[in-house]
Design a protein with these regions (language model features):
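N-terminal Rossmann-like FAD-binding beta1-loop-alpha1 element of flavoenzymes
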Residues: 22-50
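Flavin (FAD/FMN) cofactor-binding and adjacent substrate-gating region
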Residues: 1-8, 74-81, 104-180
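Central beta-strand plus flanking loop segment that forms part of the substrate or channel wall
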Residues: 68, 72-73, 118-123, 238-249
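Extreme N-terminal leader/targeting segments of oxidoreductases
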Residues: 1-26, 44-45
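Glycine-rich FAD pyrophosphate-binding loop
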Residues: 43-63
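Central helical "cap/lid" subdomain
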Residues: 214-249
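Glycine-rich active-site loop/strand segments that organize a redox cofactor
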Residues: 59, 63-94
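Helical element adjacent to the flavin cofactor pocket in flavoenzyme catalytic cores
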Residues: 138-143, 163-221, 225
Length: 249
């Protein structure tokens, strides 16, 4: 099933698949928003090769909600209770900084991706869950004053029991944004290859050999920016995974 965002892909060219051996400073494996963002920043300073097994901005990056927020459900009270206030504060500040970084990239690179500042809400229609939301709001307030507030109404045509309203959040079109990053990467004299599935990575004489489509990319550094680590050893992550699906309306 294709997401609403992925309909936009037809307006962008397909990058060629890798066809020969090559050398680079950094090889980024994975063409989602994480891989593209990593390659974007690195390409300003060094040569980068990005490899994507399918099309860039597919799967998770092409099917997300388009939210650019530090509001991730009812989460911060749990984070404070389980990891401590200082850890939770660093997590919140990192997410808020990420919002500002994306805003700067969109502005500086003139990426047309429908970026817009918005409020973000987490709400409930159940009176029994109101106290949980109020505790969450107080928890966030301990980390950053005036970032959010508890409200009884939201900007949607529905009855609610209560909500937390986060200020200074945003939304964008993830596929348009991803292809905007890709254009910047190529303009920085780095390379992107689609339909180029990495099958193995070996370290030989201090370098990394990345094997893909019967070809080899030799790199000083490798960044694995895939949904999960695809190298079986030592983690055997494929044995620890479970399937999860969510939907947004």
């Amino acid at each position: 099933m294709q997401s609403f965002w992925e309909e936009e892909r037809k307006n962008y060219k397909e990058y060629e698949s890798i066809r020969n051996d090559m050398k680079t400073s950094v090889c980024v494996v994975g063409g989602g928003l994480t891989g593209l963002t990593t390659a974007y920043y690195l390409s300003k300073y060094t040569n980068v090769v990005l490899l994507e097994r399918d099309r860039i901005c597919s799967h998770t990056s092409g099917g997300n909600t388009g939210k650019v927020t530090s509001q991730h459900g009812v989460f911060y009270k749990y984070l404070i209770d389980s990891q401590g206030k200082e850890f939770a504060k660093k997590y919140l500040k990192a997410n808020q900084k990420a919002i500002e970084n994306i805003s700067k990239i969109v502005q500086n690179e003139k990426i047309d991706c429908d970026f817009k500042r918005e409020k973000a809400y987490v709400f409930t229609a159940k009176e029994t869950e109101v106290d949980k939301l109020k505790k969450e709001q107080r928890a966030v307030d301990k980390l950053e004053k005036d970032l959010c507030q508890y409200v009884n109404k939201i900007e949607l045509p529905m009855e609610i029991a209560g909500a937390i309203e986060f200020r200074s959040q945003a939304k964008l079109h993830p596929v348009k944004y991803g292809y905007g990053l890709a254009k910047c990467i190529v303009n920085n004299n780095s390379r992107i290859y689609e339909n180029s599935q990495v099958t193995d990575i070996k370290k030989v004489d201090g370098k990394y050999e990345v094997y893909v489509n019967k070809n080899k990319v030799t790199a000083d550094y490798v960044v694995i920016a895939t949904r999960y680590p695809f190298i079986k050893i030592p983690g055997y992550y494929f044995l620890k995974m479970y399937q999860s699906t969510s939907y947004a309306i």
